[in-house]
Amino acid sequence: MVATDLKNNKNIAILGSGNLGVSIARGIVASGHYKSNQIVLTRRTLEKIQHLKDEEGFQITSDNLEAANKCAILIIGVLPAQVPQLLESIKHLVTKDHIIISVVLGITISGIRSHLQPDVYTPIVRAMPNTAIQYCESMTCIANKSDHPTKSGTAEQELADQNALEVTEKIFNCCGECITISEEAMVSAPALCSCGTAFFCRIIRAAASAGCEIGFHAEDAVRIAAQTAKGAAIMLLKNDSHPESEIDRITTPSGATIAGLNTMEHNGLSSAIIKGIVMSAEKSSKSQAALNKLNNVSS
């Protein structure tokens, strides 16, 4: 297969369309910046994504080569252990006009580059969204540079990297909020922005359970708790304020709010959340170290 001219091609291929890959595709379409027929989804078992073609208009294929040849932006969404095989299979078609965006946990930029053609410089960006991207509400961390680069690229490579970062920011800012961090920080990022979705769901579930105990029906309690959490988050983001500032505005002397907050703190609320996030970050770090060892890639 001969590589296609991709200079004016902005189509997106999601190589490995599992839950996160499909959520990304739907979020990009929901943002209004892409149509579904501009996105190619790949999966070995086509039956699992056939409905996305029939009902939502996405292109689908089981052939990663076909997808890479059609699209300039390649989002890598396979399992970490599958990354080397995937990249080796498409590397002869990957050109300097491609942009590779990896949403794979633990695989470094240098690890990805080691499986591409050494004489072709393709810009690579790592991204860590969460599944709320489907509703354009993701918090996505992205990185394409290390705090401690081993060497500087050429001016042309630096320009390609900057363009790739801007393209990635545009895609993910359309699907929520996006922040650029160093690659080193990507080790811990999932604990806050990806695992964090589950943590906040658990907190909302606990609030809803309390709502049931004080007299609300379960469905109403979940709705009240979720919307209240959403409102609190929006206040912080809109006001660009510290959480304690908003708490101070809500609490009153000897009031119900401070009584509830103090009871929660006496029972370890903040400590439990901090310990949980730190534990997730440590687990993420160990997983990356194991992957680096497996692939013989230095982080």
From Swiss-Prot:
Q: Name one Pfam family in it.
A: F420_oxidored
Example GO biological process: proline biosynthetic process
Could you state a single Gene Ontology molecular function term? pyrroline-5-carboxylate reductase activity
Gene Ontology annotations for the cellular component aspect, listed alphabetically = mitochondrion
According to UniProt, this protein's pathway is: Amino-acid biosynthesis; L-proline biosynthesis; L-proline from L-glutamate 5-semialdehyde: step 1/1
Q: What class of enzyme is it?
A: oxidoreductase
Reactions performed catalytically: L-proline + NADP(+) = (S)-1-pyrroline-5-carboxylate + NADPH + 2 H(+); L-proline + NAD(+) = (S)-1-pyrroline-5-carboxylate + NADH + 2 H(+)
Which keywords describe this protein according to UniProt?
Amino-acid biosynthesis, NADP, Oxidoreductase, Proline biosynthesis
For this protein, what is the EC number? 1.5.1.2
- Record's subunit section: Homodecamer; composed of 5 homodimers.
Q: Quote the PANTHER family the UniProt record gives.
A: PYRROLINE-5-CARBOXYLATE REDUCTASE, PYRROLINE-5-CARBOXYLATE REDUCTASE 2
Instruction: State the family named in the UniProt similarity comment for this chain.
Output: Belongs to the pyrroline-5-carboxylate reductase family.
Protein's UniProt name: Pyrroline-5-carboxylate reductase 2
Annotated organism of origin: Dictyostelium discoideum (Social amoeba)
The encoding gene is pycr2
